[in-house]
Amino acid sequence: MKHLRLLGMESEREALLKAMQDMECVEISSIDVSEEALKSGFAKPDDKALMSAQEASRAYRTALASLDRFAPEKKGMFRKRQGVSRAAFFSAESEENARTAAETINKDTRRLGEIESERTKNEALRATLAPWLTVDVPLGGADGALSVFFGTVGLNVTDDALKALADSLDGLLTWQQASSDRSLRYLLVMCHGSVKERALSALRDLGFSTVSFRGMTGTAKENDKALAENLAALEKERQEIEQRIAGLGGKREALLEASDRAAIALRREEAKSRLVGTDKVFLLEGWLPADHCAALEKALEPFTCAIETREPTEDEYPQVPVQLKNNKLTRPLNMVTEMYSLPAYGTLDPNPLMAPFFILFYGIMMADMGYGLLMMIASVIISKKYRPKGTSGELFSLLGLCGISTFIMGALTGGFFGDFLTQLVAIVSPGTVFALPKLFDPLDDLTMILIGSMALGLVQIITGMAISLIEKCKRKKFLDAFFEEITWWIVFIGIALLALGKGAAVLYVGCALVLLGPIVQGKGWGKLTGVFGSLYNHVTGYFGDILSYTRLMALMLAGSVIAQVFNMLAAMPGNVIAFIIISMLGNAMNFGLNLLGCYVHDLRLQCLEFFNKFYVDGGKPFRPMTLDTEYVDLQ
């Protein structure tokens, strides 16, 4: 990776950034504006253009969400990416059509929100009026000599209590019950104006709570009718708007393209916000892969600019982004590495070393020709038809590679959806014995598979240690390399020789070197007692790591047994059609579980058993300004 610094003309800034974005190889970094720079006139650009780009991107996403709601598209698990030429994609006509459609849809969507708010408010008002529909008295009350109150009391307030209240006011108060529910009585109370205050005080003593109909005139029934008519009008308008939005479903492709265009423009504006400049020039800093320097310089020849590239210093390593550079075989493993953590800049890319182990181990655990065929077919169809990119593309490429390994291991174990063919032939032709040729059987050769699994684990662990040895030698840490890797290899060889009855001399030498290591490395005699504990922990740790690889045998055995059990159950009815249906259902379940289970266990072996021998994580992902699209495929 190279550090890039570029000084260009402000008048060419937009065109230059577009040229860089076409190259898709430059990550633009933020520049801290110092006091000296401010005095020289350098400053960050205003954020108006960035906010405008964010708003445009948000508008298209909102419009698409509305279309998905009111004009849903028939689609399967994956959406096919339409191929679009760059000229058509960036044409002004396409942008104008999409912008008009988005504005119309979003305006109607906002109105739908207003309608929903009004509907909720009106329904709440109708619920408030419902207890008073039998009262033929204006809700606004009365003026002058007559006072009118609408309110509620508890069910414990009896008619006798209300009559006593009226009598205490010399008959100048009367009341009417409008309705009641489980807890309240809804009362209309009328009294002479001269006793209004006394009446209210007495009513409060009974627990009377006033109900206000602010802004309403006329009776409850009249207001309820008006609200019902308004709700009907709102419902009609809502249906018309939804139909209008649904009628714009044909604009979906234009909106999808526009959403991708807006995302590209937004990335460019975000990069622009990291620049500094004056009204005449601008300054850009960032990172680009070393093998793209010449191509970038050629692409920027038409512009008036000065370019400087240099190697990063060691102090800059934590800030240098990391781009994994792999071929078609190892590129799908990027998703595994990125899921764990990118390697620190200046360290080793693990993908080429991990790829053969990951693919082989997955095949060992699945080990079925039928499952392998399904994986390869799914990978080819989805990759060709839907052309997924990014992590999705890597996932289906990895699926195909693991499918090849699964098929090969299935051929070695004679598995095709378990023993599907054996059971099928037995049903079609009773008495006929048929079996696919195989090198070994997961059920009969358990010991061999167990030893083979641990042997493969030992190979991968030693590979990890060898990588660590080479890296330490590159950094001239020869003592660390000898005492932390080579001495342990001597111990392993000694254990193997002892197990074969060849004596313990090599093991004693290895243990002595392990004990000697801290002293030679300058860790002192005081650490000697801790060395014995370290020796024990390392031996048991390595043994535990190797035992972890027995999961290769366990997953192979489990998948094979489950498939055979389903085939056995399917064969019980003795009918070919029933056998095929039941067997395929059972194998589909087994395939789905193993597809995920084998990935998880394979991932664990790489991250915990292999990476911890040499891997240095903490890398920062390389995020260049790109033309990446979500919905269309630029051609």
Predicted feature locations:
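Long, charged N-terminal accessory/stalk domains
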Residues: 1-354, 382, 389-392, 396
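Conserved, carboxylate-rich catalytic/transport cores that coordinate ions
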Residues: 1-2, 9-17, 21-28, 293-635
